[in-house]
Amino acid sequence: MQGFVEDFLKPRLVDIQQISATHAKITLEPLERGFGHTLGNALRRILLSSISGCAVTEVEIDGILHEYMHKEGVKEDILDILLNLKGLSIKLFGKDEVTLYLKKSGIGPVLAKDINHDNSTEIINNKHIICNLTCSDASIDIRMKVTRGRGYITAKSRKENYDNEHIIGKLFLDVTYSPIERIMYTVESARVEQRTDLDKLIIEMETNGTIDPEDAIRKAATILAQQLEAFVDLRGVREPEIKEEKPEFEPVLLRPVDDLELTVRSANCLKAESIHYIGDLVQKTEVELLKTPNLGKKSLTEIKDVLASRGLSLGMKLDNWPPKSLLED
């Protein structure tokens, strides 16, 4: 029995089929028999319940006191407008909560691109229809709160945070934060040399555009691995006390640039310049970054704002960078 665990086959990522920017099919093999369903179901549940995202949670519409009223000059009922607001795909950079405003008048559709926002917010589906105005003197004025979270939160639980006096005119939404819109997995037979009783795991998923499917599966796998760490040593052996040493660098500098949740364009530009860690990024100056192909002033402003929200800035000097721990990785 000794070495039995080491005898297990280790799967490898054999194919990533990028069907579209939001739709991908990922294949892993070979897996020991039965492990296809074991891992596939676990990853599926984590992807649906534990990947964080952003959503509209509270809405105020001028002249509307509750969701069963009707807005003059607007084709949709208030309930339909709320459902359409739930369909917005939103990313927040450096913030966990923002308030967005939408004002529109005149005949025609009211689209997601009509929402006013700053660089801390990106709306992916700009052509998403929120409602339709039916006459020239029709108008709509919406105030919406967007928050970051994970899982499912009911409107009732949000109402409990307000007293009756401050709840009038606020419309609360049931929220599913997960950016995963569809996830399914299949298990097929795989073969390694003479063994034909192995599994191939195929995961197919679609996101709302706020996260890359490959990044989503990586985050889900990381969450699963972290939750299982406690079972690695069931004896619960007490680790020897180690004197705390002041770290050479702030922990935030050792984190990957992906943790900044930059737009895809900005992130790709940094990766092309081999800027993988936040410590790499903060040592760059504005002039150096502007020399990066395809990285313009808008991306530079985004990077500066995200760093500032973490108490960092460009042009920092870090002695003895990179640390040995990163070089060993």
Swiss-Prot record:
Residues 1-235 are annotated as: Alpha N-terminal domain (alpha-NTD). Its EC number is 2.7.7.6. One of its GO terms (cellular component) is cytoplasm. The keyword Transcription applies. It is an enzyme of class 2 (transferase). The keyword Transport does not apply. It holds the Pfam family RNA_pol_L. Homodimer. The RNAP catalytic core consists of 2 alpha, 1 beta, 1 beta' and 1 omega subunit. When a sigma factor is associated with the core the holoenzyme is formed, which can initiate transcription. NCBIfam families: PRK05182.1-2, PRK05182.2-5, rpoA. This is DNA-directed RNA polymerase subunit alpha. The gene is rpoA.
